[in-house]
């Protein structure tokens, strides 16, 4: 029997195993991919101790730039191999995984560039009474140790979004990836070491949120937590942090509005992609579609046609558009939500079938307003289509949720677009594209139960640094 590759914890440059091992499976075939080793509480404590010591001597901005640039080059050079690893451990199509790998290159490049641009500002202190001879300015300093907790649905690029800005800001960082998808995270950590990062500045601890993530959060020597995951987990983490700072990128029930004047074909094709890419397992996947009643039938025809063209299957097959969900349990839950909606009066336009962990792209209409598919994050390839007539009323519907990450609107009318931009209570409003649209350098974060803080290297660096005022008086005192 061939021995499986191993995924081990990284502490102070050493790869470490524990007595608690788990198998990482291919999400489509179920075949074992690797053996990973959960970190013990002592390992987490040791990782923080090492990171704390290393953070006291941060790299200078040029060193940070050169290391992060080197990692970007390594990702690009190993693009196909990394994408294949991600496809196997996540179940996402190789098309999507190649795209995510390319995005990780850009995330690291942007982080590298931003490492050279961390600036402060001059404070006009001389305008204050009694301060005419003083000088004041601000600088930004690293927070110290960053704990990065990442989900399964972007195993490489989300880790890059945590690690890149944290290191660019001059911090040490400890990564705790999803136990479903640790392979890409370990590969990125290895690349950082190969690029010359001092070993104490990067750590990797493996295992589930309880107890591994919890141990990382509870250690008060961790100065900052950056988390992507469910709202429930985000709230639990926030409650444990006390006065320590964090970025929380949590759930959403993402909506996109298609107005009467929209390009129906373009909107439908984009919405199909936004709803079903990665089997709908993205925080901004289109889950609620509000379509003007005058174009509803035409839009449904085009959306169904776009969905029918999507190829389901093995994520390693280049022709596959949609692979399995992260687990059969996740697919069963999605199937149950669809059946519950049908029991409440919804009608399935297309899809609704499940085979193991693979859920077919599903479109529903006549969904009850209190159905879970309209009220909670499905995280599945399921979209509910709801007609509307009045813009103000539909904006109220989109806002009538505890969440607020991103929303999209399709319209040719500038006034309509600006009205939506001003009144949709979201972290981002995307005009003439879907809620799932993202560029890695843009600010990305939500409001309400979708979290707080902002991703995107430039913005994450501001969160991961502290502003410090420097106030100077001439050595001889005021003249």
Q: Which residue ranges define each predicted feature?
A:
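Hydrophobic face of amphipathic alpha-helices that form TPR/SEL1-like repeat modules
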Residues: 1-27, 32, 124
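Residue-level signal for inorganic ion chemistry
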Residues: 30, 64, 86, 108, ...
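Glycine-rich loop-to-alpha-helix module at the N-terminal edge of alpha/beta enzyme cores
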Residues: 30-119
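Conserved C-terminal structural/oligomerization subdomain of aldehyde/semialdehyde dehydrogenase
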Residues: 31-35, 221-222, 257, 311, ...
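Short, well-ordered beta-strand elements within core beta-sheets of diverse protein domains
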Residues: 32-39, 52-57, 147-148, 256-259, ...
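Rossmann-like NAD(P) dinucleotide-binding subdomain of oxidoreductase/dehydrogenase enzymes
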Residues: 123-266, 388
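A short hydrophobic/small-residue beta-strand
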Residues: 172-174, 348, 428
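ALDH superfamily catalytic-core signature
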Residues: 224, 232-368, 392, 431, ...
């Amino acid at each position: 029997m061939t021995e499986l590759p191993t995924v081990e914890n990284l502490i102070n440059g050493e790869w470490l195993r524990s007595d608690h091992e788990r198998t990482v499976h291919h999400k489509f075939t179920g075949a074992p991919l690797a053996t990973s080793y959960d970190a013990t509480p002592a390992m987490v404590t040791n990782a923080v101790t090492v990171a704390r010591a290393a953070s006291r001597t941060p790299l200078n901005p040029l060193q940070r730039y050169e290391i992060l640039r080197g990692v970007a080059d390594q990702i690009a050079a190993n693009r196909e191999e990394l994408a294949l690893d991600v496809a196997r451990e996540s179940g996402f199509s190789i098309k999507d995984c190649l795209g995510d790998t390319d995005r990780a290159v850009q995330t690291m490049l942007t982080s590298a560039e931003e490492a050279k641009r961390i600036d402060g500002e001059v404070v006009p202190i001389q305008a204050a009474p009694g301060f005419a001879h003083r000088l004041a300015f601000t600088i930004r300093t690293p927070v110290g140790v960053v704990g990065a907790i990442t989900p399964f649905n972007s195993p490489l690029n989300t880790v890059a979004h945590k690690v890149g800005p944290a290191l660019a800001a001059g911090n040490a960082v400890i990564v705790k990836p999803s136990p479903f998808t640790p392979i890409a995270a370990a590969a990125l950590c290895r690349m950082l070491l190969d690029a010359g990062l001092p070993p104490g500045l990067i750590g990797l601890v493996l295992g589930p949120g309880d107890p591994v993530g919890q141990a990382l959060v509870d250690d008060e020597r961790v100065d900052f937590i950056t988390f992507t995951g469910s709202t429930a987990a985000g709230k639990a983490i926030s409650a444990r942090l006390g006065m320590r700072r964090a970025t929380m990128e949590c759930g959403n029930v993402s909506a996109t509005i298609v107005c009467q004047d929209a390009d129906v074909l373009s909107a439908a094709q984009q919405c199909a992609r936004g709803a079903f890419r990665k089997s709908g397992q993205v925080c901004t996947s289109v889950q609620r579609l509000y379509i003007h009643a005058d174009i509803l039938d035409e839009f449904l025809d085009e959306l169904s046609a776009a969905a029918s063209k999507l190829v389901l299957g093995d994520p390693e097959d280049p022709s596959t558009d949609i692979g399995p969900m992260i687990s059969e349990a996740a697919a069963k839950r999605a199937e149950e939500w669809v059946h519950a909606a049908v029991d409440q009066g919804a009608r399935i336009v297309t899809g609704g079938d499940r085979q193991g962990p693979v859920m077919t792209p599903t479109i529903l209409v006549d969904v009850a307003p209190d159905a879970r598919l309209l009220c909670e994050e499905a995280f599945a390839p399921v979209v509910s289509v709801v007609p509307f007539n009045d813009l103000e009323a539909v904006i109220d519907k989109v806002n009538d949720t505890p969440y607020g990450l991103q929303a999209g609107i399709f319209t040719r009318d500038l006034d309509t677009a600006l009205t939506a931009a001003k009144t949709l209570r979201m972290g981002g409003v995307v005009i003439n594209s879907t809620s799932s649209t993202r560029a890695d350098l843009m600010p990305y974060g939500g409001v309400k139960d979708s979290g707080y803080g902002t991703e995107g290297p430039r913005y994450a660096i501001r969160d991961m640094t502290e502003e410090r005022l420097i106030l100077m008086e001439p050595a001889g005192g005021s003249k």
